[in-house]
Regions:
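Alpha-helical substrate-recognition element adjacent to the catalytic core
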Residues: 2-142
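Conserved protein kinase catalytic core
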Residues: 18-20, 205, 221
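C-terminal cap/substrate-recognition subdomain and adjoining C-terminal extension
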Residues: 81, 85-111, 115-213, 217
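Positively charged, low-complexity/disordered segments
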Residues: 214-228
Length: 228
């Protein structure tokens, strides 16, 4: 029996599925900052040290929690996802599009490619809908506290995860397998079967057809907010 074709939906998260940056709902207020104050600290630190912006915000999270006596554990960050506010229609979108795909004889899969935090996304009400969540993530020491960036997902770095989905090499530790040559007919999901939904600058490399060959409409409209 022939296998069903697979259609993959790839989503940014902040300001695409939820209404603002995911740290803004609970994490930043717990430090006693407004979002503007926290991001100003993180961005200034990054500029002053010529640091990747995402690594700068992750470092700032660790340092500010240390100063305020907050245990930056995995469980704490997951709990910060409980307050995420999704855009109207997002929660039931997955069931609706899955049913539509089934009616057409295709299998639908959902993936996140986000510059936010995997742990916070896992605490949201829709995390169970995704086959894989690719987002920034911390490594935790023997005391259970965030001590080092485990994964950083930004800009052109996001495109590697499109290729992982294309080849079916989802484990981020399997770089050798990802970079090995693979015939097109062996790739699990063709680029032409992917739909990317994003809102910001960090999404541009993924939707640039020269980079990933994902489908795009000639009539599409792009909007570029101030942050990704």
């Amino acid at each position: 029996m022939n296998k069903k074709p697979i259609i993959a939906f790839l989503y940014d998260f902040d300001k695409t599925l939820c209404t603002t940056d995911m740290q803004d709902y609970t994490f930043i207020p717990s430090l006693g900052y407004t979002p503007g104050e926290f991001w100003s600290i993180a961005n200034s630190f990054g500029f002053e040290n010529r640091m990747d912006g995402l690594l700068a915000y992750m470092y700032t999270m660790i340092e500010e929690c240390r100063k305020k006596g907050i245990r930056l554990s995995r469980d704490y960050l997951v709990s910060c996802g409980h307050a995420i506010e999704l855009f109207p229609g997002v929660e039931d979108w997955f069931a609706r599009i899955n049913a539509f795909g089934e009616s057409l004889g295709v299998e639908i899969e959902h993936y996140v490619l986000s510059s936010g935090l995997r742990e916070i996304i896992e605490g949201s009400g829709v995390s169970h809908e995704f086959k894989e969540i690719y987002a920034c993530e911390f490594f935790y020491n023997e005391e259970g506290l965030a001590s080092w960036p485990k994964l950083d997902v930004n800009f052109t770095n996001k495109t590697q995860f499109v290729y992982r989905i294309n080849k079916g090499i989802l484990d981020v530790a399997k770089d050798k397998e990802l970079n090995a040559s693979m015939p097109d007919d062996s790739k699990r999901i063709p680029f032409t079967n992917m739909i990317y939904i994003g809102d910001g600058l960090s999404d541009v490399p993924c939707i640039d057809r020269k980079s990933t060959r994902l489908n795009s409409s000639h009539g599409e409209q792009s909007r570029m907010p101030s942050s990704a």
